[in-house]
Amino acid sequence: NATAKVYKGIKFRSKLELFTYRKLEDAGIDALYEKKKYVLQEGFRYSATVYEPHKTKGYIPTTTKIRDITYTPDFVDPHGRWIIEVKGFANDVFPVKWKMFKNYLMQQDDPPVLFLPRNQKQVLETIELIKEL
């Protein structure tokens, strides 16, 4: 359930994220919560003309800069060994960004182990697997 919760001054986006944080804490595992942003694709300007709808001006040519495509995982190991993305319910953008994120990480010398728990049981399994790393 995506109900925001505050714990120790940290605002978690869901109950499952809070559960994950507390279980990592209980296990003595250090984790950074939403602290590392990855740029999956740099922003740019399209060099040719693009016609797009505008709120008040109708269908017009635009030169709007395309912003960076970024990804901020939920939990990151400070030593770079693992990343946890807690996802109870995926939104429509998540599957594409997750694929882009995995592709980005594969370009690194030593990509981390990725975990995508979707419920409390999988969070507990994730923590046991992290202990073995």
State where each predicted segment sits.
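Electrostatic, structured charged patches in enzyme active sites and in nucleic-acid/phosphate-binding
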Residues: 1-133
